[in-house]
Swiss-Prot record:
Disordered, as annotated region: 278-299, 320-472, 1833-1898
GO cellular component, as recorded: chloroplast inner membrane
Source organism of this protein record: Pinus koraiensis
Name by which UniProt lists this protein: Protein TIC 214
Main localization of the protein described in the UniProt heading: plastid
Keywords (A to Z) from UniProt: Chloroplast, Membrane, Plastid, Plastid inner membrane, Protein transport, Transmembrane, Transmembrane helix, Transport
GO biological process: protein transport
InterPro entries the UniProt entry points to: TIC214 (IPR008896)
Taxonomic superkingdom: Eukaryota
Listed Pfam families: Ycf1 (PF05758)
Compartments where located: Plastid, Chloroplast inner membrane
Bilayer topology term: Multi-pass membrane protein
Length: 2046
């Protein structure tokens, strides 16, 4: 049973050790989840109070259900999406709130409504349950800090996979609710109800009703507060067309209203009595305007004007009133001047407007209500007054500000001013939903009126009214969709409303071309994490949660207890092993399913795509789950269909400034935001694909109007002046106001342009000149910059897909002149040229295209007639192309961020300039900081306004007026003086000290530095306090005075009251109480001293900053600025007074409102400055002294008693006889000793009677002691007992008995003299023991520094002590017992044999236990032989020091503990290992490898063979053998550079000027090409059986030598195929034609099963599965396939013979007749007849390069789908033909010759591979028999093979036996026959007129065919080709599925079953030797002991660099990767190193 418990205890203890903290954390966080005391808890308590237990439990259950829903929403996303949408909770709360409100208002009619009803069927139960549920879903309000709730949710989500944490948290959460229920029941039922029912004088029913109403009021208040923070659910006031018309009409009359205001002001200046009446009139007008604006939507513009008028009149009235009161001559003169100015302006206007305004004022005078509020609103909006003249408006504003300050200071009615300030604060804080919304509506109306009035002022033409409507449409962007089409929740909410609280951040004055703020909101957050030793990007948490994660990360190691008990690598290795096993099982299951006949599409693992809630998946380009080459690139597309939306954003920002002709604006497109048609990118996206203009098609001629000359013309000698070229553009794009400024700048440009090289320099000069002026030039500087960029803009030298001729014609034939009316272009412009322009120039081009298309549409609509059906059809088609088609899905997925219109800040910008419009709005719509007061300083004509802001943090600044508070942050409300606004979530971080203690610092130097820094900081603080206390106090006092201006009066009164209470009541009462206590304690009273000290205390009135004023008087304006009361020599109550009088020291403090003291004004109370600060301290000191004295006396007495007792015990133990001396000791064998003991004992028992004691001298001499007999009743029992004991002693271990016995005798002999030496030795030991604490302290300090490893060390130390002490204590007890046996005291106690036997029985049991635990148990016993006394040793010569030394070393030293160091695998970083040991272990690789391999550095061939052998590209081997390989790589790149040589050698002036700036770019392209070669060489490196034999095939890639190039005929032509991925290599190697097929996914290697890696040639795709393959099925199928192959080859040989003869006959005929060219033309005509082809011959010179992309496009354009399908069918027929005669018959009937040659070529290729595989030296097929001339002459191009092999989805790409199977040959021909015809025509088009070349010119004209795929620009040509050829790929995939099942292993790669990422993971894990590394969970026995490891003499020279090379070599080199990363992926850092897809070749351990 004990063993079973011992076995169970280890796993149980480990589980408790690991899971204990998790369970505690779960209980803790589950319990604190119930702590937030919100409305649900209040509601539950109310239910307990009113409804007793039943109602309370129901309410609690509703709350629990709500909390469960919240928790489940974290794990189940649909619940979260349903509940936490923006307005879901609001829609849920609103009806419940209304029901609660109506229910609380109604009075209960019967007592049943307040008394409980104990029935579950009561309908109130549902109401209670829903109440608790709804209230729980809302945010807690009483707990303002949301950290607790977030923390609980975060932990529940983070540890959701830990079942222990979840169960414990659930238990804690349930326990918290149970505790709350019991506490509430205790409070409500036992205490409250008991007291209410028995002791309350109020009726029980009435009291319950009061409680019911009280809680209802609390809940309603909570609901109101919650709804006040949420946005309004309905739309704001909308402006329909009628409102806009009314606003436009009222805007015209606004100027007359302004004149009427000036007229009224003149009248008020003349008459003082009319001031009050006019003020009343203004009040009435303001109220009337507000009421009209609120009640009548249609009269908003009218109400706006009336409110403006009323406010302005009231301000002018105040101004006149202050002028009349002050009688200041300057102000009076200024007011008279202003009145004259107003009168002159008013006389110029229409008197009808004045009459209308007067009538309006009379009408509004009768609607006066609430005078104080209207005055406050009028003062709030005091800057509404507007005037045409800027100076008049400024004087009015300044005078209003001055008079307002004077009225605040001197007005008799001060309460009115206070009410005004309070009303402003209330309007801004409390009535946000009402007043600020009105201000938004009024501000919108003002902006509308302002813009429309500007248009009226600019042009008085009545037609301008029509212009205002589209301009208004242009400003109101983003019109919402129809209300009925929107989803249900969105119908009632406006996401684009203006009053959303978004802050305005302006970054530059030219923010029109730059977004002011971010317009997108991030939905996903990404972060870096480590995977496979690399940093990768993945999804992460919110930024707010990351802050908490950083804090928790510091304590993660402390919380993780598992790392203390086990190796941290164990868990990782175990996890990786499980991962590998799971992948292996999954892979095997999929292979089994495939072998059982399951379709491949069901077996292959599918990638997880990123999709939305509707199930729509992202494209690969936008899928964030993809990376690297799988995702593709976005920035390389250069198609006009995929233009970036940057142009859209720029045009939207320019829409307010670019002026479009009126006729285009009035007839704009429907739903057009800008008034001049869609943007060109959106416009082209809406067109159909076939109607889109292709890159080689010309654009409309009218688009040239927007293209200004952008290059220098070659036909003119000098440059045309800039002004003539810029002015037509300025007429179109620059506003009218800036034309004069622009003309002035143009003249400056013409004069200074000759001195400058670049216009950019002049542009910078103009910028500096503009910034120095104060006019509106700053605003219009943008147009000058645009004009410069448009006029002088160099074309980019790289034009996509353009050759030399197109490029030259585009530049030479560009416009020669341009004017504003007519443009006569002489050339064509194509998309390539447009795409190379800058973004700004493309904008104007697209604008012109939009206008052009709309002009055509308008003309067609005007000229259309019903009779002409053709014209009608064209018009309808054009209309549908432009407007009606659905746009293509090329838009980016974005989340819109609502923001205000772009003209929101316009009024504020316009207010900064000197030139103001007729109506100027001076009030800003963006909130500014709260201003406390203003101070205006006059310096002559200039004025400076000093503003005093509130010290309180204002989180509403930089927000739009009227915005709601739903999105605002929660801030602390208990600190009024708060310098910065911050969230409570980060409050804990702010409280961290400036210099926190670094608990993880292990260096003393760092601590010293921190201590020095802290010391300096303390000194600075100390210096600042005592050297300049006045400045410090003054600063704080000023801050507090500014923060509390309204409470200084009451605070001063409280301070005076506290001063009197302290001096007259508190201090005397304390003195009396103290002295009464002294009298009761029989002490003398101290009344005199206390009264004297109390009188010394002085109370002085001071200012707010602590400046002393007077003892009795008050400082000036104390009620406004505050005051302080300073206590000099404050009284301190003392328990007693000392006799020696100390010198008085000046002390002071300040009194607080609560009666406490503080050291600074407005400071916090200080406990050290209280009355009792010196009262308890002396008492505590005296008590401490008494306690110390008592403890000392008690300790002395106790020690004396213990010493006396110790002496008595010592005397009794030692006895008085001492120890007898033994004369001699000799060596006795163990067997002899046992026999003598046994015989002697037996003889004594036989001869001696019972009870007698006879001493045996012989035995006593040997053992050194005397024996006594034991009285035993039965002698037989005694004999048997002694025999058993002696035998048991002998059985245990004879050597310890003998050794110990003899050692005891030796010890006895040495210690027989006296105990003096023993005493001295004990004293020495006592000294050593006293040194132990010091050593322990030193070790403790070291362990604290290495605290990370202290726990491991302690555990290691305990394990060592467990073994060391156990064995040592056993032997120590045995030796000491035997030592004391020889004393006289033992002899008197009993028989020696009994005691000795018992001791060794115990030793036997313990030894059996320890023998299994201690590994070197027997070696310890062997070491003990040193203690044995030999006969030749002299016992007397041994000293006692040596004897006691042996006693202390008698315990076994367990040196096997070092294996625990090895177990932790800490390697050289372990801090507890000495440096020398580290070096030794590092050299011998003891900590890392069990069996290090003996490899040398120089013998690289030996360790290179350890790797899997691969055949690498020459680029890699260029570093291995540079002299042999370096030049060949460079030669391959030279041909690519030669293509750009003609660009540099051109002598044409225009061409040279254009290409010269791009030479650097060309060099970069050349460098990128070389890096492309290097990169693809890494990706496409192939495997070879012997890596050292690569030099044999080295000459294959050397294509520039004559010997390596196939001898071609004179009519042959080698094409430039470097842009394609599949390349035809025509090489001569043993007269054999070899075809190289290269692609990025070339034959994926069998990494999962290395035995499948067969021989592979770099130019041969075939593989041969070895005979030892694990795929037995493939072995069986291979035999069948070989037979079929042989039969098919026979048929192919027959076909070859027939066709070869026919080809030779045709050669003879062509040479005789010389009609080769005629036959070429005839064959072309035959093709045109049969297939309907239209081929245009291109006549170019012999050096013309073939543009492959254009040719492919023309082929696909000309060939229809039907023709291609016919070709495929014909190909199928030809393949099935077996009769040669029938084959020739079809051939004679004009069947396409290229198709025939393709079939022949395919058969030849298969036949050639078969011959080469059978016999490498066979040359049955000669290249001269089938010459390249035959292929090219008969229109067989290299693209035949190229198009055939270029399909990335070819099923034979990864086939090991694809070329050997019959079915796959058929499929390959069926699929690839389609592309052959297309490439036939390609070759014919490109080679029709190519002249013949000589054989010696061939090497010069050959462009090297690179064996690697190069990157190319994705242009329109390639896109169109891919789209057209997509159905071919799908057809190929469809046919691939119809193949024979028996060939599945030969046509499918097993590794493709898994995804690439999981495949790569499986490869790496499969290479890890996880089972043989002994790194899992293993025993300590398997680890070698340190003695064995340290004793090894073998030194292994395994260097670290060699290990790294062994892992990396020969896969890749890091320095090459860095360079390749920079040029291939266009990055300068290593952020995209993961995209390289480099395969790691691990070590192949055999």
């Amino acid at each position: 049973m004990i063993r079973v418990l011992g076995l169970l205890w280890d796993p149980l203890s480990s589980w408790v050790e690991v899971s204990g903290p998790i369970i505690l954390f779960g209980l803790y966080y589950g319990f604190i989840a119930t702590l937030p005391f919100g409305p649900s808890k209040i509601y539950s308590m109310r239910s307990f109070f009113l409804g007793e237990t039943l109602y309370g439990i129901i309410a609690i259950s509703g709350s629990i259900t709500g909390q469960l829903i919240v928790f489940l929403s974290m794990y189940y996303s649909p619940i979260y999406a349903a509940l936490w949408k923006p307005h879901a909770i609001t829609l849920l709360v609103i009806p419940y709130t209304f029901c609660r409100v109506f229910r609380s208002l109604e009075k209960p009619s019967s007592p049943e409504s307040t008394h409980p009803m104990n029935s579950i069927k009561n309908p109130k139960i549902l109401s209670l349950f829903m109440g608790g549920l709804i209230l729980q879903l809302l945010n807690p309000i009483l707990l303002a800090n949301p950290v607790l709730t977030r923390l609980v949710n975060l932990f529940l989500f983070r540890y959701s996979d830990n079942i222990s944490f979840m169960i414990s948290s659930f238990c804690g959460w349930l326990g918290g609710h149970i505790l709350f229920i019991n506490l509430t029941k205790l409070v409500s039922l036992r205490l409250v109800s008991f007291r209410i029912e028995r002791n309350s004088p109020i009726d029980h029913t009435s009291l319950r009703r009061y409680i019911h109403q009280t809680f209802s009021v609390l809940l309603i208040s909570y609901f109101s507060f919650y709804l006040g923070r949420s946005p309004l659910i309905f739309h704001r006031k909308k402006k329909d067309n009628k409102k806009k018309d009314r606003s436009a009409a009222m805007a015209k009359k606004d100027r007359s209203v302004a004149m009427a205001k000036k007229n009224c002001s003149v009248a008020m200046v003349k008459k003082d009595r009319s001031v009050a009446e006019d003020e009343d009139r203004s009040v009435a007008m303001a109220k009337k305007g507000r009421s009209v604006a609120e009640d009548e939507d249609r009269s908003e513009p009218l109400a706006m004007v009336m409110v403006q008028e009323a406010r302005s009149v009231s301000f002018i009235a105040k101004k006149a009133r202050s002028v009349a009161e002050d009688k200041d001559p300057e102000d009076e003169h200024r007011s008279v001047a202003m009145a004259k100015k107003a009168r002159s302006v008013a006389e110029d206007k229409d008197p009808e407007d004045e009459h209308r305004s007067v009538a309006m004022a009379k009408k509004d005078r009768s609607v006066a209500e609430d005078e104080d509020r209207s005055v406050a609103m009028a003062k709030k909006d005091r800057s509404v007054a507007e005037d045409e003249d800027r100076s008049v408006a400024e004087d009015e504003d300044r005078s209003v500000a001055e008079d307002e300050d004077r009225s605040v200071a001197e007005d008799e009615d001060r309460s009115v001013a206070e009410d005004e300030d309070r009303s402003v604060a209330e309007d801004e804080d409390r009535f946000v939903a009402e007043d600020e919304d009105r201000s938004v509506a009024e501000d919108e109306d003002r902006s509308v009126a302002e813009d429309e009035d500007r248009s009226v002022a600019e042009d008085e033409d009545p037609e301008d009214e029509d212009r205002s409507v589209p301009r208004e449409q242009k400003k109101l962007k983003g019109l919402p969709i129809s209300w009925f089409k929107q989803p249900c929740p969105i119908k009632f909410f406006d996401p684009d409303r203006i009053y959303q609280p978004i802050r305005y951040i302006g970054n530059s004055p030219f923010h029109c071309l730059k977004p002011v703020m971010r317009t997108e909101v991030s939905q996903y957050f990404f972060g870096a994490y480590s995977s496979d030793g690399k940093k990768r990007i993945s999804f992460t948490l919110l930024p707010s949660v990351l802050a908490l994660g950083e804090k928790l990360g510091k304590y993660r190691d402390l919380l993780d207890t598992s790392c203390l008990s086990e190796d941290p690598y164990h868990r990782w290795n175990h996890t990786m092993k499980r991962r590998r096993d799971s992948l292996e099982n999954e892979f095997s299951d999929r292979v089994k399913a495939l072998s059982h006949g399951s379709p491949a599409e069901n077996v292959i693992e599918r990638r997880v795509k990123f999709s939305n809630s509707q199930g729509d998946s992202f494209t690969e380009m936008y899928d964030p789950l993809l990376n690297g080459a799988l995702r593709g690139t976005i920035d390389q597309f250069e198609s006009p269909k995929m233009l970036n939306d940057l142009i859209i954003s720029i045009i939207s920002n320019l829409s307010d400034f670019i002026e479009i002709p009126i006729k285009d604006c009035k007839e704009g497109f429907p739903n057009d935001q800008f008034g001049y048609g869609y943007h060109i990118s959106e416009h082209w996206q809406e067109l159909e694909h076939k109607s889109f203009r292709l890159p080689w098609e010309p654009l409309p001629t009218d688009t040239f109007r927007s293209l200004v000359p952008s290059t220098k013309s070659s036909r003119r000698g000098k440059v045309e002046p800039i002004s003539k070229r810029l002015y037509p553009l300025a007429e179109r794009i620059i506003p009218n106001k800036a034309k004069k400024i622009f003309e002035e700048y143009l003249s400056n440009i013409d004069s200074s342009f000759g001195k400058l090289i670049y216009p950019k320099d002049l542009l910078e000069m103009q910028i500096q000149e503009i910034y120095t002026k104060d006019d509106d030039s700053l605003i219009h500087f943008l147009w000058l910059e645009i004009a410069f960029r448009v006029a002088y803009m160099d074309l980019a030298p790289e034009i996509a897909s353009c050759n030399e001729r197109i490029y030259t014609n585009s530049l030479v034939n560009i416009y020669n002149r341009i004017d504003g009316r007519n443009v006569a272009p002489t050339g064509t412009v194509k998309w390539e040229l447009i795409l190379s322009l800058f973004t700004t120039k493309q904008i104007f081009l697209f604008e012109s295209l939009a206008q052009h298309e709309w002009t055509i549409l308008r003309n067609c609509r005007g000229n259309v007639s019903t009779d002409d059906s053709t014209q009608t059809k064209d018009f309808i088609d054009l209309y549908g192309k432009i407007l009606l088609n659905e746009p293509l899905q090329f838009r980016e997925i974005k989340k819109h961020l609502p923001r205000w219109p772009s003209d929101l800040m316009r009024a504020e910008r316009d207010g900064d300039g000197d030139d103001r419009g007729p109506i100027q709005i001076s009030t800003s719509r963006i909130r500014t900081r709260k201003v406390k007061s203003k101070l205006t300083l006059d310096f002559g004509k200039e004025r400076i306004v000093l503003k005093r802001y509130h010290a309180e943090s204002d989180y509403r600044r930089s927000l739009i007026r009227g915005s709601m508070r739903a999105k605002r942050r929660k801030i602390m409300i208990w600190k009024r003086v708060q310098p910065n606004v911050h969230s409570l979530f980060f409050l804990r971080r702010m409280e961290i000290p400036t210099y926190p203690k670094d608990y993880y610092d292990t260096f003393d130097s760092g601590r010293v530095n921190q201590e020095q820094i802290q010391k300096e900081v303390r000194e600075k603080i100390h210096r600042g306090k005592y050297l300049d206390p006045v400045l410090h106090n003054t600063t704080l006092a000023e801050q507090v005075c500014l923060a509390w201006p309204e409470v200084h009066y009451f605070r001063g009164l409280i301070l005076v009251a506290q001063s009197n209470i302290r001096k007259n009541i508190i201090l005397p009462s304390l003195i009396i109480a103290k002295n009464i206590g002294r009298i009761l304690l029989f002490k003398a009273p101290e009344f005199a001293q206390d009264w004297e000290e109390m009188k010394e205390e002085l109370h002085i009135k001071c200012g707010s900053d602590g400046t002393e004023f007077s003892k009795k008087g008050f400082p000036d304006k104390w009620y406004k600025y505050g005051m302080q009361i300073k206590l000099i020599f404050p009284f301190r109550l003392k328990p007693w007074h000392s006799q020696s009088k100390k010198r008085l020291r000046l002390r002071w403090s300040y009194l607080t409102t609560l009666g406490f003291e503080t050291d600074i004004p407005f400071g916090d109370p200080k406990p050290k400055l209280g009355i009792f600060s010196e009262f308890f301290q002396p008492i505590f000191k005296k008590v401490k002294k008494g306690l110390k004295k008592g403890l000392k006396k008690g300790l002395k007495k106790g020690l004396k008693r213990e010493l006396i007792l110790f002496k008595k015990v010592k005397r009794r133990l030692m006895g008085s006889t001492g120890i007898r001396r033994v004369s001699r000791v000799r060596y006795i064998d163990k067997s002899e000793l046992n026999d003598r003991i046994q015989n002697k004992l037996l003889s004594e028992t036989e001869t001696t009677p019972m009870g007698s004691a006879n001493d045996s001298s012989e035995v006593n001499d040997q053992f050194g002691y005397e024996t006594q007999t034991i009285n035993v009743k039965d002698p037989d029992d005694w004999t048997t007992t002694m025999k058993e004991r002696i035998e048991s002693i002998a059985i245990i271990n004879s050597s310890p008995i003998t050794g110990m016995s003899l050692m005891d005798s030796e010890i006895h002999t040495g210690s027989k003299g006296s105990f003096n030496i023993l005493g001295s030795t004990l004293k020495k030991r006592l000294v050593q023991i006293r040194r132990i604490p010091g050593r322990f302290r030193n070790k403790s300090v070291q362990l604290i520094r290495k605290r990370f490893y202290s726990m491991k060390l302690m555990k290691l130390f305990l394990k060592r002590m467990d073994r060391y002490l156990l064995l040592s204590v056993i032997h120590f007890i045995g030796s000491n017992i035997k030592f004391w046996i020889r004393s006289a005291w033992i002899r008197s106690t009993g028989n020696i044999a009994t005691i000795y036997g018992r001791i060794f029985i115990i030793n036997n049991d313990i030894s059996k236990i320890n023998r299994g635990k201690i590994t070197n148990y027997y070696s310890i016993n062997e070491k003990r032989k040193d203690f044995e006394i030999r006969p030749d040793r002299n016992m007397l010569s041994m000293s006692q020091a040596y004897v006691f030394h042996k006693i202390w070393q008698i315990g076994a030293i367990d040196r096997s503990y070092s294996k625990y160091f090895l177990k932790y695998r800490a390697q050289t970083s372990y801090p507890l290992i000495k440096k020398k040991i580290k070096e030794l272990l590092d050299i011998q690789r003891i900590l890392d490898h069990e069996k290090p391999q003996d490899l040398k550095e120089n013998d690289w061939k030996q360790w290179l063979r350890c790797f899997d052998r691969y055949k690498l590209s020459p680029q890699i081997w260029s570093r291995i053998n540079p002299q042999k390989w370096r030049n060949r790589v460079n030669k391959q790149c030279t041909c690519y550079e030669e293509r750009f040589i003609p660009y540099e050698k051109k002598k044409d002036y225009i061409f040279a000027t254009v290409i010269e700036p791009s030479l650097g770019l060309l060099r970069k392209m050349n460098k990128r090409y070389r890096y492309d070669l290097l990169s693809y060489s890494y990706l496409n490196s192939t495997k070879e059986l012997d890596i050292l034999n690569l030099t044999k095939d080295s000459d294959i890639l050397n294509l520039t030598k004559d010997s390596d190039i196939l001898n071609l005929t004179k009519d042959s032509d080698i094409l430039n195929l470097t842009k394609d991925s599949d390349i035809l290599n025509l090489t001569k190697d043993s007269d054999t034609l070899k075809i190289e097929k290269r692609r990025s996914g070339l034959d994926l290697k069998f990494w999962l099963f290395p035995e499948l890696s067969g021989k592979e040639n770099i130019y041969d795709n075939s593989k041969f599965i070895p005979g030892y393959s694990i795929l037995s099925e493939a072995q069986e199928r291979k035999k069948i396939e070989e037979k079929e192959r042989e039969e098919r080859i026979k048929v192919i040989e027959e076909r070859i013979g027939i066709i070869r003869s026919d080809v030779q006959n045709k050669k003879v005929e062509e040479k005789q007749t010389g009609t080769g060219e005629v036959e070429e033309k005839q064959t072309g005509k035959v093709k045109q007849k049969q297939f309907g082809l239209k081929v245009e011959d291109q006549k170019t010179d012999g050096k013309k390069k073939t543009n492959q992309v254009l040719v492919q496009h023309k082929i696909l354009k000309d060939i229809g789908e039907e023709d291609i399908s016919d070709l495929a069918g014909m190909c199928r027929i030809l393949i099935e033909i077996e009769d040669p005669t029938k084959f020739m018959q079809i051939y004679e009937e004009n069947i396409n010759l290229n198709l025939m040659f393709l079939i022949i070529y395919e058969d030849l290729k298969g036949y050639e591979k078969y011959i080469n595989a059978r016999d490498s030296n066979a040359n049955d097929i000669n290249a001269n028999d089938i010459n390249a001339n035959d292929i090219n002459a008969k229109d067989s191009n290299a693209n035949d093979i190229n198009a055939k092999d270029s399909n990335a989805n070819d099923i034979n790409a990864n086939d090991s036996n694809a070329k050997d199977s019959n079915a796959n040959d058929i499929n390959a021909k069926d699929i690839n026959a389609k592309d052959s015809n297309a490439n036939d025509i390609n070759a014919k088009d490109s080679n029709a007129d190519v002249p013949k070349k000589k054989e010696d010119e061939i090497p010069k004209t050959v462009v090297s065919s690179e064996p690697y795929r190069l990157s190319s620009i994705v242009n329109d040509n390639l896109l169109i080709y891919k789209i057209v050829s997509m159905w071919l790929k799908s057809e190929k995939i469809k046919r691939a599925g119809l193949g024979d099942d028996k060939n599945i292993l030969s046509s499918f790669n097993l590794e493709d079953i898994l995804l690439p990422k999981r495949r790569r993971e499986f490869r790496i894990l499969n290479r890890f030797d996880l089972e043989n590394d002994h790194v899992g969970f293993f025993n300590g026995k398997s680890i070698q002991n340190d003695e064995e490891l340290m004793g090894r003499d073998q030194h292994l020279s395994v260097d670290t660099t060699q290990r790294i090379k062994r892992f990396l070599w020969p896969s890749y080199r890091l320095e090459d990767l860095l360079c390749m990363n920079r040029y291939w992926f266009n990055t300068n850092d290593g952020s995209r190193s993961a995209m390289l897809r480099i395969r790691m070749y691990p070590l192949n351990v055999n």
